[in-house]
Amino acid sequence: YPNTFWMNPQYLIKLEEEDEDQEDGESGCTFLVGLIQKHRRRQRKMGEDMHTIGFGIYEVPEELTGQTNIHLSKNFFLTHRARERSDTFINLREVLNRFKLPPGEYILVPSTFEPNKDGDFCIRVFSEKKADYQVVDDEIEADLEENDASEDDIDDGFRRLFAQLAGEDAEISAFELQTILRRVLAKRQDIKSDGFSIETCRIMVDMLDSDGSAKLGLKEFYILWTKIQKYQKIYREIDVDRSGTMNSYEMRKALEEAGFKLPCQLHQVIVARFADDQLIIDFDNFVRCLVRLETLFRISKQLDSENTGTIELDLISWLCFSVL
């Protein structure tokens, strides 16, 4: 299942020293890998059986040697075969195999046999000689565009549209925004949506509300409109099966297209928060996720002016940010 296999956790194994005793006459580094399912007794009491599990071991390409912050993509696994695999995928508590490989760097990828199975596990690696093991994951990055636009960017047609939508007060509230976006999405056949929830509209307004009015003026609405068009473009391009929705395994690529690189742990949280019980993410939840991420990254950047990677919050600040 290439669409989802690459989303599994990835572990770097660095084999540095060959075995001293080459019993079979073949040089290399001997090591054991054990993949163990956790909490299965508890799950069995709930009527769930063991998952069918196994793993693959891939040689790290020369151009990526020495890097630990790159989660290998779907394209890598489509173009590279496993150097070794577990003997079988089987529904046992532990899968254990012995291997011998030349010194070098390898990626270990555990997985269930069937896609979209969630499970807890631990991995044990024993080597005859010195070796190093660590998790491989993306560094946290956000490429944020400036939330600004000049008056010259806004054409007369958009000004007339805004005046028609905003009414006498020349501002758009979250409730008015919800009505506008519902009409827009109702005309689209390539995106399945019941419209935007009022919660999503509120966080969009909050992100761009520069004067604290809880409404959007002309320039603010123009910036938001531009963002929504960008989000629509990403959503359509990532929806490769043309279902009008997005599968959870497509979300990681979509976030990267939107400028966010996130570790696996955070991707798991995002899927749990924004996907439905069929692991589908609709356009409303996709936009809500992007807006929340952008808002949190901007807050972090503002509070961490020296780019240390840490921030300090007092209780009231934490509570205010938590209700975003």
UniProtKB/Swiss-Prot annotation:
Q: Which Pfam families match?
A: Calpain_III, EF-hand_8
Which stretches of sequence are listed as region Domain III? Answer: 1-138
The name on file for this protein is: Calpain-2 catalytic subunit
Provide the residue positions that the database annotates as binding Ca(2+) 7. 239, 241, 243, 245, 250
Q: Which cofactor does it need?
A: Ca(2+)
Query: Where found in the cell?
Result: Cytoplasm; Cell membrane
Task: Cite the InterPro entries for this sequence.
Answer: C2_III, Calpain_cysteine_protease, Calpain_domain_III, Calpain_III, Calpain_III_sf, EF-hand-dom_pair, EF_Hand_1_Ca_BS, EF_hand_dom
